[in-house]
Amino acid sequence: VRSRGLGDVYKRQGKTWAYSDFYQAKPGITDYTKLKPNGHHPANTAHVKEYIDFASAHGIDGILVEGWNEGWEDWASYRKDRQFLFNKAYPDFDVKELQRYAKEKGVQMVMHHETAANAADYERQLDEAFQFMVDNGYHAVKTGYVGYIIPRNEYHSSQWMNNHYIHVARRAADYKVMVNSHEAVRPTGLCRTYPNWLAQESARGGEFETMGGNDPDHTCILPFTRLKGGPMDYTPGIFETRLSYYNGEKPNERVHTTLVKQMALYMTMPSPIQMVADLPSNYARFPDAFRFIEDVAVDWDNSWYLEAEPGDYITVARKAKGEDEWFVGGITDENSRTATIPFSWLPEGKQYIATIYEDGKDADWDTNPQSYRIRKVVVTPKSVLKQKLAASGGVAISIKEADKAEMKGLKTIR
């Protein structure tokens, strides 16, 4: 499958990049500092340095920090004419020191601009905000529009807001800044015109698991609907799925997937910017599973959709861009099933080792989501794998070429 949906349609209509001399945007994976214990200001210099260390140690390209700038004390009122300042950090967030430290560790800092739905005020501050980013070494921003749009209670999908999103993308391009927009309108292929508009949320992403939850079939629908318009920042990678772990007031609420399904989402929900959305301490509890997130690519040379039924299941294989590495991700809805995974898309004449991350025999998204198993097998282009998926479960596979010594003692899938 080579189509990028509406992006290709838009291109065929004669539209081209609005910024043909735009810099090379590099895809990457980013740690996400939102799921944190509350009661204090976690977006402080010392704490963020811990995340930079974590990112550096695990090959994560960047760190996205929410809550760095002044205005968060009562931001959910959604009614102030000016809620946030986008060029003024809290006193305990040292912008220049963190940039120095991150650069030393080989990690990019990603800016966050939550507008609390005050899009008009954001436009007034836009040039100052982007200049602040440039002056301090930020090259990417996540924007947010939570609430009722100020000043006129516009819908997020209104013409006024559509014009706003495009205006932000254009001005960001002028400053050579990449944009990942949340609470935005569904995409229509404009990421081809503005290549710095790297991704959007524009559907119920992973954070909605804390607000009533996403049904198990939700991520089996999005690849056939939302994803046709362009990349989605879904924020996968949640290993601790019990919300009671974070909030004792929600003892019976949980993320509606198994741990392995969270890993598979990195393939079924493609985006050139992917989040590593859980706490580092949770990943430390499952280091063998986290290895897959360390290894998985975010940019692809080719993709093969192996089986799919909208709302029920989807299995996709992808080749990492410029590398002889392949990855497979398969997910299912609330029903357990057996996926049929052929490997005929692999180059002929070679043998490969497939590392399979699979749901455990007793895995279930509701009762036992963290049950998983990892095994290695040999595959060839003639192999066909019959793989069991738990209820709202998945499978994630990484594949590399192998020599005879590496294959010794491993089972070959026929």
What are these model-predicted stretches?
Residues 47-68, 135-139:
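Catalytic domains of carbohydrate-active enzymes, especially glycoside hydrolases
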